Amino acid sequence: MARKPGQDFRSAQSGLSELKSRLFFVIGALLVFRAGSFVPIPGIDAAVLAELFEQQKGTIVEMFNMFSGGALERASILALGIMPYISASIVVQLLTVVHPALAELKKEGEAGRRKISQYTRYGTLVLATFQAIGIATGLPNMVNNLVVIDQTMFTLIATVSLVTGTMFLMWLGEQITERGIGNGISILIFAGIVAGLPKAIGQTIEQARQGELHVLLLLLIAVLAFAVIYFVVFMERGQRRIVVNYAKRQQGRKVFAAQSTHLPLKINMAGVIPAIFASSIILFPGTLAQWFGQNGESSTFGWLTDVSLALSPGQPLYVMLYAAAIIFFCFFYTALVFNPRETADNLKKSGAFVPGIRPGEQTAKYIDKVMTRLTLAGALYITFICLIPEFMMVAWNVRFYFGGTSLLIVVVVIMDFMAQVQTHLMSHQYESVLKKANLKGYGR
């Protein structure tokens, strides 16, 4: 059978067309996300709200506001952002380890994954509702004249608006994952972080222009930033490869020769979750002090002010607890997402083995030993990245828009996005090659 002229070209064009449509979908979804972050909750005085957020520097509120792309400081319907979904996902992952029914559900393949995703949505709804009620009832008590309508009506409207906004973002993230490129939730967080980058760069340049920030110091910070980004990319791509062999075996009339492959284990298996949770916990007392401890010693919660001062960025106690929290969550979350015993059992069932290690229990212990060392290295790496901005702020008295957590998220999401694009292009190249081979075989 003769091959039609231009068939390869049309196949390549089809692959590029699909990639373009996915990219345009991601861009469109991000535009909707950014537009939604400017839709305010009815009944709030914007000027009073702006003054309130000036007092929230260095608290958990500032971090969540950055993740939401500034939606929180504008009291947008998307102010809660996607954090309730992340929290619900981690809770459900923890339950799949400790709850037998969910553990079995996890093993049921695609059907089990869909069921777990549904439970995550329910958890997101519950967490978003509690957080929305907290914000709706807490905001009017933080400052006078913030709410310009009846407080009961505002509580109802704000709660419904915030919960709806979070559920919409969850749906939008799932649509990006399915119809776009990359992990939709990560891309939304990435978009929220980089949305404030132009403003931060403009403020930094203005400080340098007015002499508040020396030009040489600015150049040094830029060089260090590029060096840290390079280091993050290097560490995120790093992995330990455990050699795995498959013995010669026979299935029916087919004989499969002995094969050798490897089991890749990432240095940073936990990703950015430990940094996010550690920041949330360390900054939480300061946030409570801002909300409840503003009346000093006469307040019931006045002691929170002393705690928040001890845990303010740059303080020795803050640095030690922050580092300890990151290391703890690295080991904790890695234990949730990776099970050495399950991996060893899967290798044994498939007829694979690690050279020099007995299949089963001994293999599980060996993988656990390797993973523990990798997790320690990954935890120290994340701690180093997250503490660099803290040390620089103390040494040079310069405030950074990008903390270590934000930098990790941005770099990891970009790397994942580029890998997804490359995988998509490669899959279409393989598809084109296979079609060509099939047509040649058919034409003989």
UniProtKB/Swiss-Prot annotation:
It is a multi-pass membrane protein. The chain crosses the membrane at residues 24-44, 77-97, 123-143, 153-173, 181-201, 215-235, 269-289, 318-338, 376-396, 400-420. It comes from the Bacteria. Keywords: Cell inner membrane, Cell membrane, Membrane, Protein transport, Translocation, Transmembrane, Transmembrane helix, Transport. One of its GO terms (molecular function) is signal sequence binding. Its main location: membrane. It holds the Pfam family SecY. One of its GO terms (cellular component) is cell envelope Sec protein transport complex. GO terms for biological process: protein transport by the Sec complex; SRP-dependent cotranslational protein targeting to membrane, translocation. Disulfide bonds: none annotated. It is found in: Cell inner membrane. Component of the Sec protein translocase complex. Heterotrimer consisting of SecY, SecE and SecG subunits. The heterotrimers can form oligomers, although 1 heterotrimer is thought to be able to translocate proteins. Interacts with the ribosome. Interacts with SecDF, and other proteins may be involved. Interacts with SecA. The central subunit of the protein translocation channel SecYEG. Consists of two halves formed by TMs 1-5 and 6-10. These two domains form a lateral gate at the front which open onto the bilayer between TMs 2 and 7, and are clamped together by SecE at the back. The channel is closed by both a pore ring composed of hydrophobic SecY resides and a short helix (helix 2A) on the extracellular side of the membrane which forms a plug. The plug probably moves laterally to allow the channel to open. The ring and the pore may move independently. HAMAP family: SecY (MF_01465). Belongs to the SecY/SEC61-alpha family. This is Protein translocase subunit SecY. It comes from Vibrio cholerae serotype O1 (strain ATCC 39315 / El Tor Inaba N16961).
